[in-house]
């Protein structure tokens, strides 16, 4: 049974409020490993935002770090602007991801965060979270775990761009995306790409034409079925092998 104070807090917060303990992606987010008392303390500092519309930004490069953002649904892309004025995408964030970690060092965001589709986020005031984590070892440990995961993702991306050819880059991107969907309880074999082919090419250092050509090649080989933004993995082993993995995505 849900405690009465939790119900009252939901009513006061509005229709989009979901307690951390009841959130479907809590095991991927900060609440993982926290007990009910700790969850209640965390829940008290979180602001449930209204839907973030496609194209809307959570923060811009140079903005002061005030909050971290936990994605409840949707997709957020992070990007920087080069000296030449070009956009360079640095990541795609899905439900369960936290956005804003890279601002902790300097206190200012080095990048932009923009919604690729209508998204729901929880805004977590950083100073309050930092103070709370000093009193809750489990919370601090989970924060470290999440930051470690982001660092590992950055390292994997560097390796992807430095050692793999165009085919291997795209295969690794689709393979990793399917694994991330699986972690969130979605099908790892059938999913919709929320980012454009131009975004994918920008992220992987490839042209839009190359992305389209490779998707056609993957489909012709029987590895994928592609219909617009929808991807179906037909030959899981072949994709994993091309991506540099030997285990299945499921």
UniProtKB/Swiss-Prot annotation:
InterPro entries found in the cross-reference section: cNMP-bd_dom (IPR000595), cNMP-bd_dom_sf (IPR018490), Env_Response_Regulators (IPR050397), HTH_CRP (IPR012318), RmlC-like_jellyroll (IPR014710), Tscrpt_reg_HTH_Crp-type_CS (IPR018335), WH-like_DNA-bd_sf (IPR036388), WH_DNA-bd_sf (IPR036390)
Annotated segments matching region Activating region 2A: 47-50
Region (Activating region 2C): 127-128
Region Activating region 1A: start-end pairs: 71-75
Start and end residues of each stretch annotated as Activating region 3B: 81
Impact noted for substituting residue 88 to E: Decrease in activity; no effect on DNA-binding
Region (Activating region 3C) residue spans: 85-87
GO terms for biological process, alphabetical: anaerobic respiration; positive regulation of DNA-templated transcription; regulation of DNA-templated transcription; response to nitric oxide
Region described as Essential for the oxygen-regulated activity: spans on this chain: 20-29
Protein role: Global transcription factor that controls the expression of over 100 target genes in response to anoxia. It facilitates the adaptation to anaerobic growth conditions by regulating the expression of gene products that are involved in anaerobic energy metabolism. When the terminal electron acceptor, O(2), is no longer available, it represses the synthesis of enzymes involved in aerobic respiration and increases the synthesis of enzymes required for anaerobic respiration.
Comment on protein domains: The amino acid residues contacting the FNR target site on the DNA (5'-TTGATNNNNATCAA-3') are located in the putative DNA-recognition helix (alphaF), which contains the FNR motif (EXXSR). Three surface-exposed loops forming activating region 1 (AR1) in the downstream subunit of the dimer contact the C-terminal domain of the alpha subunit (alphaCTD) of RNA polymerase for activation of class I promoters (the 161-121 loop is the major AR1 activating determinant).
UniProt protein name: Fumarate and nitrate reduction regulatory protein
Species this protein is from: Escherichia coli (strain K12)
